[in-house]
């Protein structure tokens, strides 16, 4: 399933359409192990003084497709590399401020978003606000995961 990367058109799902941030500079997808890949990139933060931070996304072959950890929006060339690996079926958000691109993968691929219970998708630091995205499922230490023989340890 593909969609216009900045589309706000309905995906036909129960989730409201979103406007997505553009892809930023990143490297090639690198295979680390059989069924495990990694890609590094950067993010420019919209602050008074411009700040760049490094980002990374891990891709794991799961039970029924690819699982993305700490999603990072890829360029069209990067998405072609990702598509060559298989179908994206799940996105896992492990920590706060690591999910800004989760909605992009939900809209483009119909991926199910999983997030650690108690997290919120909010913009900005230190100022609670409305959630801009809701996961399809909240994860706890006892939740089933989309990777065979995987387990989750929740810290905090």
Where are these regions (language model features)?
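Residues that flank catalytic or metal-binding motifs in active/ligand-binding sites
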Residues: 56, 109, 148
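Active-site metal-binding motif and surrounding structural segment of the metallo-beta-lactamase
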Residues: 73-116
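Short, flexible loop segments at the rims of nucleotide/cofactor-binding pockets, characterized by
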Residues: 14-17, 45-49, 67-72, 90-93, ...
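Long, non-catalytic terminal segments
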Residues: 1-45
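Short active-site-adjacent helix-start/loop capping segments
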Residues: 47-48, 68, 76-79, 99-103, ...
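Conserved beta-strand hairpin/beta-sheet module of binuclear metal-dependent hydrolase folds
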Residues: 27-77
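Conserved beta-strand scaffold positions in the cores of enzyme catalytic domains, especially
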Residues: 36-38, 91, 113, 152
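Metallo-beta-lactamase
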Residues: 117-156
């Amino acid at each position: 399933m593909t969609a216009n990367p900045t589309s706000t058109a309905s995906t036909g799902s129960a989730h409201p359409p979103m406007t997505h941030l553009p892809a930023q500079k990143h490297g090639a997808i690198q295979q680390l192990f059989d069924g495990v890949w990694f890609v590094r990139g950067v993010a420019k933060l919209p602050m008074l003084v411009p700040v760049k931070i490094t980002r990374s996304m891990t891709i794991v072959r799961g039970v029924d497709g690819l699982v993305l950890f700490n999603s990072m929006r890829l360029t069209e060339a990067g998405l072609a590399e990702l598509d060559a690996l298989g179908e994206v079926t799940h996105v896992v958000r492990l920590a706060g401020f690591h999910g800004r691109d989760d909605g992009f993968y939900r809209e483009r691929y119909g991926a199910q978003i999983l997030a650690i219970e108690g997290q919120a998708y909010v913009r900005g630091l230190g100022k609670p606000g409305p959630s801009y995205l809701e996961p399809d499922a909240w994860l706890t230490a006892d939740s089933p995961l989309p990777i065979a023989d995987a387990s989750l340890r929740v810290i905090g």
